Amino acid sequence: MKVEILEFKEFTAHKLYEILRLRSEVFVVEQDCVYQDLDNKDQKAIHILGSIKGVVVAYTRFFKPGDYFENASIGRVVVHPKYRGKDYGKEIMQESIDYARTKGHSSLIISAQCYLDKFYTDLGFTATGKEYLEDGIPHQEMVMRLN
C-alpha cells in the first residue's frame, strides 16, 4: 500500500472526490448514518491515504492539538469494504501514529466506535471509560501515550 500524507490544499479534485466517496460509502451508506460527513474540519486536517494501484483503500485524518480535541487526534478511520481483512486499517493507523510521533506529540485521542475496541486496543490505545452516542452510534474516548 502506497501512503500519502497531504494537507487539504494539496488535494486534486479527483483525490478529494475519491476520499469523500469512500467516507460516504462507509460512514453514511454502510453504517446507515444519515448525518453530515462534511464537517468543515477537513481544511485543518492532515490527510493520510493508503492506495493500491491508484485506488484509495484506507484513510485517516490527523489533527494537531486544539484543532479538534485538546490533544492531537486521529479520526475518520476508514478502509474500503473490498479491501478489509488485509490489515490495511492497522497499516494506515500505524502510519498515522508514526506521523504524530514525528511531529513531537506526546499523546493521541480518538473517538472510537465501541465495536472496534479490540482493533484500537491492539494498536496501543486505552479506553478512558467515557462512552457516548455520536451520530446515533456508540463511541468511546480512547487515548495513547506516544513517549
Model regions and ranges:
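Short amphipathic alpha-helix that is part of the acyltransferase structural core
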Residues: 1-47, 51-56
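A short beta-turn/loop motif at secondary-structure boundaries
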Residues: 38-43, 66, 133-134
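Conserved beta-strand in the GNAT
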Residues: 49, 55-65, 71-78
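A conserved beta-turn-beta hairpin within the catalytic core of GNAT-like acetyltransferases
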Residues: 64-74, 84, 134-139
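Conserved acetyl-CoA-binding loop-helix of GNAT-fold acetyltransferases
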Residues: 79, 85-98
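Conserved GNAT acetyl-CoA-binding A-motif
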Residues: 93, 100-113
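C-terminal "cap" of GNAT-fold acetyltransferases
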Residues: 114, 133-147
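Conserved acetyl-CoA-binding loop of GNAT-fold acetyltransferases
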Residues: 121-130
